[in-house]
């Protein structure tokens, strides 16, 4: 199956891209999500605006105790640490597990976030890192927490004509600990469960998140509170917190296979976090 007819424009600057965007226009970065969906006619566009050559979308910089990563940075650039890593290995670890190398060479950080597939890596991993996103449109730039940007299944807070320009994440301290576990039935496919945890007392960061389980990645409130408080319970207290969190964010029956899968992934991620402590 092939995409419906559309016109193609390659933007030379971000301002040119913003002018070209409009009703029934789509922005193309790496094309690893948009093009397959257009070929399947799940989505369509009158105009496709190519952002792939815009160097300004690949720029990275420090902003105090946070780091800004351009939306055009590819998964492979993060995996190979061709940009500064503010996460003490967390982001390269996540990037290395995305699909296949050919996909990682083309796919971009921003493209994954805009696509907003709840089973994708970056929406879940960056939520656990306390990320904020920057978007730009005709009215200027605005920033918001990633949790607000992700509204639901393949739905974001982007307005018509806006472009995601980058992501801001905290620079983790030497006291930071993290774990990231993902379950796939075979290598390279989308996950059936993702369980990241990030804890950094110096940054006031303690987040446990569950991905590939609902309409969007969801914060696990009880486990996040335990991480933020520096508590490391085990046994019944831990399993009860995990069970209650999974049921709250998924609504699954406790006897079901998906519930057991998510619960197991969370407990393994917690155990891995303790090993790193």
What are these regions (language model features)?
Residues 1-277:
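C-terminal structural segment of proteins
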